[in-house]
Structure formats: structure tokens, C-alpha cells
Regions:
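N-terminal topogenic membrane-targeting module
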Residues: 1-38
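A composition-driven signal for long, intrinsically disordered, charge-rich low-complexity tracts
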Residues: 29-31, 43, 81
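Short glycine-rich, basic-tinged beta-strand/loop micro-motifs
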Residues: 38-53
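Cytosol-/stroma-facing membrane-proximal "stalk/adaptor" domains immediately downstream
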Residues: 50-91
Length: 91
């Protein structure tokens, strides 16, 4: 419980990825688009399966998850769905 795990089939854009982090399960949906010279994942929507599992997580936790996602998808813009979106917009 509470461990970090990233499950993803990077070769299949149609398959969502899953992240288990500090007891919360997140899912990410990948969208293919064009960059300057290739077709790549350019947008990712991430949401949590159970909002109650977010208790105790901080903005720093979500910034860490963004960094981890960007290691696989460096060209992607990460969009969090609510309630995480609200936290990330503040400040």
C-alpha cells in the first residue's frame, strides 16, 4: 500500500495508462497529434478513480506525477480532471 507503480503500454496510444500512488489509482488517456516533425502523444487527461483516496496528497505529489508522465511523453500537455484540476490552478 502506498507504493508508486506506473503501468503503460507505450506502443499503444489507444490504451490508457494507470498510476498507483500513495493509495490512489489514477488513469490517463493519451491523445495523438503532430509535433514539428512526428506524430506523438500531445495531450493526456488524467483523473483519479476514487476522489476520497486523494486525502493527504499535495500539489507537490501531482507535480511529481507530471514529471513521471513527461518522461514517457515529453511533448504532452497534461490535463488533470477535477478535483485535482482546481488544486493545480491555485496560486
Amino acid at each position: 500500500k502506498g507504493q508508486y507503480y506506473f503501468y503503460d503500454d507505450v506502443k499503444n496510444v489507444r490504451k490508457n495508462f494507470f498510476i498507483s500512488y500513495k493509495g490512489a489509482l489514477f488513469e490517463g488517456e493519451k491523445y495523438l497529434g503532430t509535433t514539428d516533425d512526428a506524430f506523438e502523444v500531445v495531450s493526456i487527461f488524467v483523473w483519479v478513480h476514487d476522489a476520497m483516496s486523494l486525502q493527504g496528497l499535495t500539489k507537490e505529489d501531482f507535480l511529481y506525477l507530471e514529471k513521471e508522465i513527461l518522461m514517457n511523453y515529453p511533448k504532452a500537455k497534461i490535463n488533470w480532471k477535477n478535483p485535482i484540476e482546481q488544486l493545480m490552478k491555485e496560486n
